[in-house]
Each structure stands twice: as structure tokens, then as C-alpha cells.
């Protein structure tokens, strides 16, 4: 269902239903003690799980992969791309990511899969917040997803259940977009279509 709605939303925005470019990132969230497997993210100082997501240039979810928070971004990216092989994305060949994904193991894997990783970095000498084209899109998607309570803290016993919660949130966002409902902070992908800096 997520794939069908994303393709419909892209067509509604005048885009090809299959994106040529994706943006990926990960986010760590706390997991309840009653939940399943967890891990410790030293960078975020958080015990929980990590959500690795890939979105298109409109910020619409393509695929999600949930791991223990201790899994590195590069390892999570490989798992995400392996998961994506189950989906029909014939045009997707380039993926943007931040410097955390600048790892040899990831470059070797994507080369074998005919993908290209584009590392986004801040302009030299830049200070303060600098939105990076396409990279900002995936960070905004995380903001939309966090508007849904079940994505703020993980209470699920399995990774698959955690992924299902993300897909449910994504489906809700795209249904609102397609039915032209009033956009709220957790559903307003439409503004991206009007921003030429984020168009692809």
C-alpha cells in the first residue's frame, strides 16, 4: 500500500511515479524495557532502536529498516538497500547521505548493486543551520513521523512491528496529501513541491 500511494502522490505532483534519486538517514529512539532487542547508541547516548529510512525527493517514504541502536549507519544502510531489493524501484540509482555514511564497506556494496552514493556536506566556511538539498528532505520526514506517538518511543517486541508502525504513519501522511486535506506538521509534504530547491 505504501508503494502504491507514493506512486500516486508523485503522479499528482507531476513527477514520474518511480524516483531516480533517494535520500537516506537514520534516527535513534528510546525503546521500552518491555520491548524486544535493543542496543546502545554511543553518539546519541540512547538505549533503544535505530530507524533507517529512504525517502524520495518529495520526502515520501520508500523503505524503512529497523535495527538495534548499536548498529552503525553504514551497516544499517546496507540492510536498508538489501530490503529495498524486494521493491520495484527501476529508476532509483543515486542516494544522498551525510558524512556518517562515508565508509568503504558501504561504497563497495553499492558499487556491486549499481547504486551511487552522494555524500552531502556543508559548504566550507558555513555557520549556523544550512539546509542541504535533498538531505533536508529526509530530516523533515523524520519530523513528520515523530508527530505520531508510536514512533516517538518503541514499545514493539519485534523489528518488523516497529517497521509496520512507520509504514502506517507514512500511509496516513500520503492519504492526507492525496485527498487534499488540510496539511498539518505531520502531513504537509505538499509544500516541498512548491520549493524549487528541493525539486528533482
Listing of model-derived features with the role each one plays in the protein:
Residues 1-200:
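Short alpha-helical elements
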Amino acid at each position: 500500500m505504501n508503494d502504491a500511494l507514493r506512486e500516486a502522490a508523485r503522479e499528482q505532483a507531476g513527477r514520474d511515479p518511480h524516483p531516480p534519486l533517494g535520500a537516506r538517514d537514520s534516527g535513534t529512539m528510546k525503546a521500552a524495557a518491555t520491548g524486544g532487542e535493543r542496543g546502545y547508541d554511543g553518539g546519541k547516548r540512547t538505549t533503544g532502536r535505530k530507524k533507517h529510512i529512504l525517502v524520495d525527493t518529495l520526502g515520501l517514504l520508500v523503505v524503512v529498516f529497523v535495527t538495534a541502536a548499536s548498529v552503525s549507519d553504514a551497516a544499517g544502510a546496507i540492510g536498508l538497500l538489501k530490503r529495498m531489493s524486494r521493491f520495484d524501484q527501476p529508476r532509483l540509482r543515486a542516494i544522498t547521505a551525510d558524512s556518517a555514511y562515508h565508509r568503504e564497506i558501504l561504497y563497495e556494496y553499492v558499487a556491486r548493486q549499481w547504486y551511487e552514493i552522494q555524500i552531502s556536506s556543508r559548504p566550507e566556511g558555513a555557520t549556523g543551520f544550512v539546509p542541504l538539498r535533498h538531505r533536508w528532505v529526509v530530516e523533515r520526514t523524520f519530523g513528520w513521523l515523530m508527530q505520531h506517538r508510536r514512533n516517538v518511543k518503541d514499545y514493539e517486541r519485534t523489528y518488523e512491528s516497529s517497521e509496520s508502525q512507520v509504514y502506517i504513519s507514512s500511509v496516513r501522511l500520503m492519504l492526507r496529501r492525496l485527498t487534499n486535506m488540510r496539511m498539518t506538521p505531520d502531513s504537509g509534504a505538499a509544500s516541498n513541491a512548491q520549493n524549487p530547491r528541493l525539486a528533482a
